[in-house]
Regions:
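C-terminal alpha-helical interaction module
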Residues: 1-173
Length: 173
C-alpha cells in the first residue's frame, strides 16, 4: 500500500512491465540525476507552489510563493526553447510530474488559487509542450476537466465558500 505519488510513478514505470509488455522507461538510468534535479525544482516551486500560493494565510507568504512559482514557470519556458521536454528530447518522469499541474492550471489554479500573473496558454513553449503531452497515446482519455474543477471548487470551502464550479474557461481539450 502506498499513496506517495513520487513513489507510485516509479512503480508504474516498470513494476508491471512483465504483465503489460510495456517497455517504456520514463526514468532511464543515464538521465536519473537530471530527472531528480528537475523534479525537485518542479515539485517545490510549481506542483507544491500552486498550493503554497492558494493556501497562503498571509500576504507575505502569498507573494513569496507567487513570485517563486512564476519565476520557475519563466525558467521552464526558456528551457523549452532549447528542447522538446524537460530533460532533453525524450519524455521522462519529470514531464509527467509537471503535466499534472499544467493541465489544471488555467482552469483551477489561475483563479481558485490566485496564481493569476499568467495562464499557461500565455507561455507559448509551455503551452505547446502541454498540448504535446496531452496528445500522447492514452493521456487525453484520463483527463476529465469537469471532475478536476468540481473537486477543487467544491471541496475547498475556505477558498470558495459557495462551492460554485465555474463554467469556463474554454480550453484546447
Amino acid at each position: 500500500m502506498n499513496n506517495e505519488s513520487s513513489q507510485i510513478i516509479r512503480m508504474f514505470n516498470s513494476a508491471f512491465n512483465h504483465l503489460t509488455g510495456n517497455e517504456d522507461d520514463y526514468y532511464p538510468e543515464a538521465l536519473r540525476e537530471q530527472i531528480d534535479k528537475i523534479n525537485e525544482e518542479v515539485y517545490h516551486h510549481i506542483n507544491n507552489g500552486v498550493y503554497k500560493t492558494g493556501f497562503a494565510t498571509t500576504k507575505e507568504a502569498y507573494e513569496e510563493a507567487f513570485d517563486v512559482l512564476f519565476q520557475t514557470l519563466d525558467t521552464i519556458e526558456k528551457m523549452l526553447t532549447l528542447t522538446n521536454f524537460l530533460v532533453g528530447n525524450i519524455v521522462t518522469e519529470a514531464d509527467w510530474r509537471l503535466f499534472t499541474t499544467l493541465i489544471r492550471f488555467d482552469a483551477v489554479y489561475f483563479n481558485h488559487f490566485k496564481c493569476n500573473k499568467k495562464r499557461i496558454c500565455d507561455y507559448p513553449k509551455i503551452y505547446k509542450y502541454l498540448q504535446n503531452l496531452f496528445n500522447f497515446k492514452g493521456i487525453k482519455e484520463t483527463v476529465f476537466m469537469d471532475h478536476i474543477k468540481t473537486h477543487y471548487y467544491a471541496s475547498h470551502t475556505m477558498i470558495n465558500p459557495t462551492g460554485i464550479v465555474p463554467k469556463g474557461p474554454d480550453l484546447f481539450f
